């Protein structure tokens, strides 16, 4: 045990409208934050006075105060400083405008704002979504959070898109409560891997979430907050326009990039509000290896938990008890296609996969589909397993699963994403 007195402690006195920013990069480093007095929040979640909050390697934190406070840091962050220049007041004003629209929707029994946050990579899109969601639930709203970022999404594991009804603020050092999320398997960490399939899933998720909004009066007036990926040029821009249409978006917040802001002003309907917001100076650019590590960490947390450890199950599944598929096959030239079939149909085709050593370490999504007669690619998933061993002699896969056997369904979808289980 480390002697608590040996841990360095630093007090920071923050004036109103300023924030304490710190980062932890060193392996196995922990930093504890304690609000000694005043009021402060982390991305819209209020801190409780004298309660310790623990952050670990990889954390990039900005604690903001509207009225002033004193914060104690225990531990050795790689960098820690107080910033007086912050866009938080602008973000609060944007949220006030959304709240005005929600009040109006509530009075008229109409649909609340459908909000989309866009911008290139590493400008703070996920953070802004979190701030909007936390502020909304603190005011008694129940918005739906939609995450279309297949590389660094916050609802399920990478390689998926999903939606979640948010009923309480996110805990300070964690994400939103993951009760009953609606998740669709995509199977890649970038939309460019299969653009056609990505658009199909966006349309399906939009259709389902808009129906759910209508079915829940509280959610209906609260609306949606949609997070997007950082691909904003070429096909990436086309995906943004497709999302606007599919979700019937009413407001777009563009972070940091004026070119994207002006393109959207030109291309979306006049009824859609397009608003430019600056990124925070605390936003940190991530390297390719940091992104890969973040994806691994998301998958690890899915099986093993973060603060509260989870204990996944390992068991064998017979080849004969499951059907494994992937979505999409290489496109054929038009001259080779059957009559009436288009080249893009290949991108959304269900292709059978024979169990074998090539599946080792791959993530498999467990589809809710009961047979291939259903539209499997547009059916949401129950959860995920990881293949930890393939025994061709016994014709079994050994899998890591969050719940004990048997698998809830037998149709499994292969993801490009892999996870090396080191436990």
Swiss-Prot record:
Protein task: Required for endonucleolytic cleavage during polyadenylation-dependent pre-mRNA 3'-end formation.
Binding site for ATP: 19, 60, 122-127
A Pfam family that the UniProt record links to this protein: CLP1_N
Gene Ontology cellular component terms for the protein in this record: mRNA cleavage factor complex; nucleus
Entry-linked InterPro entries: Clp1, Clp1/Grc3, Clp1_C, Clp1_C_sf, Clp1_N, Clp1_N_sf, CLP1_P, P-loop_NTPase
UniProt-recorded Gene Ontology molecular function terms: ATP binding; polynucleotide 5'-hydroxyl-kinase activity
Organism classification: Eukaryota, Metazoa, Ecdysozoa, Arthropoda, Hexapoda
Organism: Anopheles gambiae (African malaria mosquito)
Annotated family: Belongs to the Clp1 family. Clp1 subfamily.
Keyword Nucleus applies: yes
Gene it is expressed from: cbc
Broad class of the protein's primary localization: nucleus
Disulfide bonds: none
UniProt record, GO biological process: mRNA 3'-end processing; tRNA splicing, via endonucleolytic cleavage and ligation
Keywords of the record: ATP-binding, mRNA processing, Nucleotide-binding, Nucleus
Entry's localization field: Nucleus
Coiled-coil region list: none
Protein name per UniProt: Protein CLP1 homolog
